[in-house]
């Protein structure tokens, strides 16, 4: 072996070379080596040919390059190595192997001192969990973290992710995804979109900037799927044991086939199937609108079982035949449902009622207006069939032209604000991640892989 003091205070050792030529290139002394194996400290590399620039700390290598260090193995087509900086400019078919991770790129600047790799032209990361690709990226080996920019895609057995840029710490499983993002979560049967996402190993996901969550739940009793759409400025999903929680903030809109709502804040518990709405909320179920400072929506097997609101709620039911608006208000209101239809409303204390009546021909025929400490209304298939009022003070209003416009104090009816079912399904914007590697694998990489398989 020949030691050559070509790198300042360090030495490059020529362990093997079929041919050694000393020459001058552009006035610089160069040693040209063919079928070379060189080492410097714990850095060892092989190539078809290598040029040692004897007057400066550089080695240029060409063809079938393999670099071995205690922490990584690298393959490339060409290499410029700056010894003092411990920096390599790797070009061509570049593969970096670190533990169970493989990184692929076409143009990579890798620093052996800091263990940081800059992937300038495409990056593909493969590990036991899945595959991640992007237009460019930076990989930090010591912290096992990475930044990816441009057309970022991640796919594993549980999810598919797209975005403009991504930061991920693989050790802590913390990630931040930015701009034009979509997450398809096959484990939880959910889809998320927005412009910023945080996620960690606890299952927490925080979504903001045009946040959207679509959740599909299958009814265990009927096997029918119910889809819930939630929009908001911010949405946070967390999990504790088998219970999932949803917290949404800022202009929160919900649509499902069972109910829809509008609020400043929403909280949901999957075990209790309870939605809690805060901040001047409104909730709709079929032809009923409920408004109040606080509303809870209790589901059972994904069907609305109960709506509760306090203090000072106001409920409106639109008659499906006449279009007239039945109204009820008070301090607390509870509405109960059976098989999706309203079956009973309790309102107490200080209840007030305006209910429009119909004749046998289903034509408008006056109205009942009353006040009572407590009112209970009973319905059959959505139609009022009986009313109970304690200490009732009321009157019957005969039919007249303006009766349809009569309103109780505090009247709220805003059907134009009711969220509607989204008409466009969010879809990935990028083609699927290819199962194939981005280039034909270098010969030394293939040979090494074949040996390990034997």
Per-region residue spans from a language model:
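N-terminal amphipathic/hydrophobic interface segments
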Residues: 7-454
């Amino acid at each position: 072996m020949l030691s050559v003091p070509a790198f300042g205070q360090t030495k490059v050792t020529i362990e093997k070379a079929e041919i050694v030529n000393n020459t001058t290139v552009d006035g610089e002394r160069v040693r040209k080596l063919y079928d070379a194996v060189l080492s410097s400290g714990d850095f060892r590399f092989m190539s078809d040919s290598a040029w040692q620039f004897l007057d400066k700390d550089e080695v240029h290598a060409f063809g079938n390059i393999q670099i071995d260090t205690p922490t990584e193995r690298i393959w490339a087509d060409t290499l410029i190595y700056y010894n003092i900086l411990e920096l390599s400019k790797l070009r061509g078919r570049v593969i970096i192997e670190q533990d169970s991770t493989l990184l692929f790129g076409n143009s990579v600047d890798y620093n052996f001192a800091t263990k940081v790799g800059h992937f300038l032209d495409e990056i593909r990361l493969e590990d036991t969990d899945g595959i991640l690709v992007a237009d460019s990226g930076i990989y930090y080996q010591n912290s096992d973290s990475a930044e990816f920019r441009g057309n970022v895609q991640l796919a594993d057995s549980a999810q598919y992710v797209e975005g403009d840029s991504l930061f991920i710490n693989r050790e802590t499983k913390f990630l931040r995804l930015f701009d034009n993002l979509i997450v398809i979560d096959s484990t939880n049967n959910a889809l998320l979109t927005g412009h910023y996402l945080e996620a960690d190993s606890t299952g927490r996901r925080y979504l903001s900037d045009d946040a959207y969550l679509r959740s599909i739940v299958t009814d265990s009793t009927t096997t029918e799927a119910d889809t819930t759409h939630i929009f908001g400025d911010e949405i946070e999903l967390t999990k504790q044991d088998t219970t999932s929680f949803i917290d949404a903030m800022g202009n929160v809109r919900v649509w499902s086939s069972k109910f829809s709502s509008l609020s400043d804040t929403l909280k949901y518990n999957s075990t209790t199937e309870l939605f809690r709405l805060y901040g001047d909320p409104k909730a709709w179920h079929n032809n009923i609108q409920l408004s109040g400072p606080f509303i809870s929506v209790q589901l059972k097997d994904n069907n609305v079982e109960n709506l509760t609101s306090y203090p000072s709620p106001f409920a409106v039911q639109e008659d499906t035949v006449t279009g007239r608006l039945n109204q009820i208000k008070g301090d607390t209101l509870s509405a109960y449902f059976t098989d999706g239809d309203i079956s009973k409303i309790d309102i107490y204390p200080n209840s007030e009622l305006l209910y429009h009546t119909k004749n046998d021909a289903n034509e408008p025929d006056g109205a009942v207006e009353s006040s009572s400490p407590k009112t209970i209304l009973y319905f059959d298939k959505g139609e009022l069939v009986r009313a109970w009022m304690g200490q009732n003070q009321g009157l019957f209003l005969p039919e007249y032209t303006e009766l349809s416009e009569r309103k109780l104090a505090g009247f709220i009816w805003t059907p134009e604000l009711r969220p509607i079912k989204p008409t466009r399904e969010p879809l990935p914007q990028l083609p699927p991640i290819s199962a194939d590697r981005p280039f034909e694998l270098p010969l030394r990489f293939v040979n090494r892989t074949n040996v390990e398989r034997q």
